[in-house]
């Protein structure tokens, strides 16, 4: 995988650099800017040194991509590389059409097809991770007032088994269950049961100067996003009620930040749906009197299109 084996075929890195405008746009959706030279340097010189099997020509093998992402988001981590591996992960998951045009076929052990089991169909839900990426980790000082009880959990979703697609014609898919990306909130394998109630806002055991409990914020992980995406395979246009119900639950339990919302937009909505959400949301901005705002500067202040300066402060 990843080798330009015949004339006209490009490696994953070459293909992504050839279509770097897409990479740059995806980064822009997170409010970040990227550089093609920096991406090439990371792919050819930095990530191969992580010891997880990353080839210098790049790869679309999700296991390897997730392993690199785990290191980048780890402790101490590589904050300057976060946006690059995040967008690379998005491309690995979404597989835009230009990958096929470049001849970048899915890795035999990386393209996962989720198939419902005939017996006891319930989807596994991955637990939360105990650590957070250093890039956007911060302490939040909250009131000592107890949180309202969480809403009743939704009905169990069908269980899925991760079936590895065999791209070799005539062979049966490998039915072994793929382990989860390394950066899960508990380090357990995919499908393993973990402790419940692991929410992003977690008490640290310390208190601030006023005596209020100090909590640490933990952003979404790849596992969180995969679970939510797999639980709602239909697009927002096809099943808006399902997606809205999921978002209501996520906002209630996770209190997502601006960065988290960008992750949710990219995971649960198509490009067209994202643009529609942004457009309609800006139309719904109201002032303190409940009157619709038309001043673009005020709209931008309340509904920023790019990552605001106060994020992560």
Swiss-Prot record:
Biased composition (Polar residues): 172-183
Pfam families registered for this protein in UniProt: Gag_MA, Gag_p30
GO BP: viral budding via host ESCRT complex
Motif PTAP/PSAP motif, residue numbers: 127-130
UniProt short sequence motif PPXY motif, positions renumbered to this chain: 154-157
GO CC term, one of those recorded: host cell plasma membrane
Lipidation (N-myristoyl glycine): 2
Keywords on record: Capsid protein, Host cell membrane, Host membrane, Host-virus interaction, Lipoprotein, Membrane, Myristate, RNA-binding, Viral budding, Viral budding via the host ESCRT complexes, Viral matrix protein, Viral nucleoprotein, Viral release from host cell, Virion
GO molecular function: RNA binding; structural constituent of virion
Keyword Metal-binding among record annotations: no
Record-linked InterPro entries: G_retro_matrix, G_retro_matrix_sf, Gag_P30, Retrov_capsid_N, Retroviral_Gag-Pol_poly, Retrovr_matrix
Region feature Disordered, mapped onto this chain: 113-135, 167-197, 280-313
Domain of life: Viruses
Family annotation (Gene3D superfamilies): Gamma-retroviral matrix domain, Human Immunodeficiency Virus Type 1 Capsid Protein
Name by which UniProt lists this protein: Gag polyprotein
Lineage of the species this protein comes from: Viruses, Riboviria, Pararnavirae, Artverviricota, Revtraviricetes
């Amino acid at each position: 995988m990843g080798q330009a084996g015949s004339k006209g075929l490009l490696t994953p890195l070459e293909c992504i650099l050839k279509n770097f405008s897409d990479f740059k746009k995806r980064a822009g959706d997170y409010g970040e800017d990227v550089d093609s030279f920096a991406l090439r340097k990371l792919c050819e010189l930095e990530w191969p040194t992580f010891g997880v099997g990353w080839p210098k020509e790049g790869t679309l093998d999700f296991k390897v991509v997730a392993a690199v992402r785990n290191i980048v988001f780890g402790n101490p981590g590589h904050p300057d590389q976060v946006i690059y591996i995040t967008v690379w992960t998005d491309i690995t998951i979404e597989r835009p059409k230009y990958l096929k045009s470049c001849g970048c076929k899915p890795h035999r052990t990386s393209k996962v097809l989720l198939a419902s089991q005939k017996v006891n169909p319930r989807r596994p839900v991955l637990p939360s991770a105990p650590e957070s990426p250093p890039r956007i980790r911060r302490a939040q000082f909250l009131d000592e007032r107890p949180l309202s009880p969480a809403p009743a959990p939704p009905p169990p979703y069908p269980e899925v088994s991760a079936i590895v697609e065999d791209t070799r014609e005539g062979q049966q898919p490998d039915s072994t269950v793929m382990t989860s990306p390394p950066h899960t909130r508990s380090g357990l394998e995919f499908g393993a049961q973990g402790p419940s109630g692991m929410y992003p806002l977690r008490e640290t055991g310390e208190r601030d100067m006023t005596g209020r409990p100090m909590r640490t914020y933990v952003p979404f992980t790849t596992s969180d996003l995969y679970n939510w995406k797999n639980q709602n395979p239909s697009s927002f246009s096809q099943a808006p009620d399902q997606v809205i119900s999921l978002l209501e639950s996520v906002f209630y339990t996770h209190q997502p930040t601006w960065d988290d919302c960008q992750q949710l937009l990219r995971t649960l909505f198509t490009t067209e749906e994202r643009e529609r959400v942004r457009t309609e949301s800006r139309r719904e901005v109201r002032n303190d009197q409940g009157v619709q705002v038309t001043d673009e500067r005020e709209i931008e202040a309340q509904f920023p299109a790019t990552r605001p300066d106060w994020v992560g402060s």
